[in-house]
Amino acid sequence: MIPAFEAIKALNTNRKNEIVVGTMTPNRYWELISDNPGKDLPVFGAMGKASSLGLGLALAKPKDKVWVLDGDGSILMNLGSLITIADQKPENFCHFVFQDGVYFTTGGQPIPGGETVDLAGIALKSG
């Protein structure tokens, strides 16, 4: 597994002009290194909603690419968004989920299925 900060650095290096919607653990790192903070939309107060917000931006701004930087606990709070995203099929949307097995922001409690859940599999089966 790639450490979250290393993955964030790689994304920042490869970023062109994408709008970045970040939440929870990945956003904590993203805010430290983003080269284009004017195109960043941090959503700390909306745990579980970054995917929905990112989808809305992608649909409203089809010429702009939108990246969502999400946490595993956050996406588990809104798994239904994966079905909605799959249904809309936005070509300008990319969802990155960082898996650390805990609700970091609320004190590090383990997430349900933290060691066994297959988030990539859930996303693929969602469409």
Show the residue positions of the predicted features.
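Active-site pocket-lining segments that scaffold enzyme catalytic pockets across diverse folds
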Residues: 1-17
